[in-house]
Amino acid sequence: MSVSFENKETNRGVLTFTISQDQIKPELDRVFKSVKKSLNVPGFRKGHLPRPIFDKKFGEESLYQDVMNALLPNAYEAAVKEAGLEVVAQPKIDVTSMEKGQDWVITAEVVTKPEVKLGDYKNLEVSVDVEKEVTDADVEERIERERNNLAELVIKEAAAENGDTVVIDFVGSIDGVEFDGGKGENFSLGLGSGQFIPGFEDQLVGHSAGETVDVIVTFPEDYQAEDLAGKEAQFVTTIHEVKAKEVPALDDELAKDIDEEVETLADLKEKYRKELAAAKEEAYKDAVEGAAIDTAVENAEIVELPEEMIHEEVHRSVNEFLGNLQRQGINPDMYFQITGTTQEDLHNQYQAEAESRTKTNLVIEAVAKAEGFDASEEEIQKEVEQLAADYNMEVAQVQNLLSADMLKHDITIKKAVELITSTATVK
């Protein structure tokens, strides 16, 4: 294989490489054997057409595209490795020569990893806005939240207040004409919940069961249904029931209802205090790690971050988001329709995050390289076993999914993050 690389501009260049006849000939034979199985040529049994007859009738060149498809991926990877390149985006491939009997010549326009000029990344001073101390108010808030979850809705005779739930029928119209989606029956609406458009819930406060209220609202200019956006609507709303939330007494019985492992309210408070302390400690560590890494990234200089890297990160994020939707049974088209957004909007939403994450990854990789971090076979095996335990998989499954190079990369990245974080001090 002949390989050359020509820099065209910062982080961009053209990689030229060849696929030799020593590789082409056996692949031609393999492709021919596969193709001839389906050929029907008069005078020959199906699958028994001699190669010389095939070449004369169809031409050897008719096999070239299949041969190229088979050989190109490995040839490209080998060329990148031989040229010592770190390619960070999909290449633009061009086959410049596929002459019979000659080595084939391919060019690839590639984007390479940008240079990272590290600044200070050890012994950093950082600020974090996370409290480690657990207060009585924290514990009480946690218990109150659980207490509210056990609350029951009871019918009240008095007028509705914020926080109450009303059961209503409503019919919406614009200029006296009803519109699609503007009608509901026996709908339970929490006042103050923000379920309905601004102003709707407020106009039901102070009214009682049996009343009919003309609710006048204006749809927001950015409302998802464009035919309603910015328009004033009237909702004739009948209140059937007003319900208030009735919370259980704050006592030992409540504690048992919340958590069957405790006997008293004091036990529950102590348990929650320990859980909150552990959670706050973890949040504090995460905050220190985030602040230290952010500072290391700010101190570094990345020489012309390629847009392609950001685009690929955005693409990964969008695909991950849409994949999560589908796993929850939500069709992406339906999501865009409900939210009034497009796939382009989603890409734009992830743009800044993708740029930040790309810069962070580059700096951490540069730290790992500068420190000469590596991963031993023992460390790789330990990582495999940990992943298998975390995801309830067999060790062999993890090894099939992740290559040794991928595992080694992850381990060195963890070491770099640990170095940046462990040497940082909080102001």
From Swiss-Prot:
Enzyme class (EC, first level): isomerase
PROSITE patterns xrefs: FKBP_PPIASE
GO CC term, one of those recorded: cytoplasm
Keywords for this protein: Cell cycle, Cell division, Chaperone, Cytoplasm, Isomerase, Rotamase
Catalytic activity from the UniProt record: [protein]-peptidylproline (omega=180) = [protein]-peptidylproline (omega=0)
Compartments where located: Cytoplasm
Pfam families per UniProt: FKBP_C (PF00254), Trigger_C (PF05698), Trigger_N (PF05697)
EC number: 5.2.1.8
Domain PPIase FKBP-type: 163-248
One annotated GO molecular function: ribosome binding
GO biological-process terms attached to the record: 'de novo' cotranslational protein folding; cell division; chaperone-mediated protein folding; protein transport; protein unfolding
Location, primary (coarse class): cytoplasm
Domain of life assignment: Bacteria
Family: Belongs to the FKBP-type PPIase family. Tig subfamily.
PANTHER family according to UniProt: TRIGGER FACTOR CHAPERONE AND PEPTIDYL-PROLYL CIS/TRANS ISOMERASE, TRIGGER FACTOR-LIKE PROTEIN TIG, CHLOROPLASTIC
HAMAP family for the chain: Trigger_factor_Tig
Protein known as: Trigger factor
Organism: Streptococcus pneumoniae (strain Hungary19A-6)
Taxonomic lineage of the native organism: Bacteria, Bacillati, Bacillota, Bacilli, Lactobacillales
Gene: tig
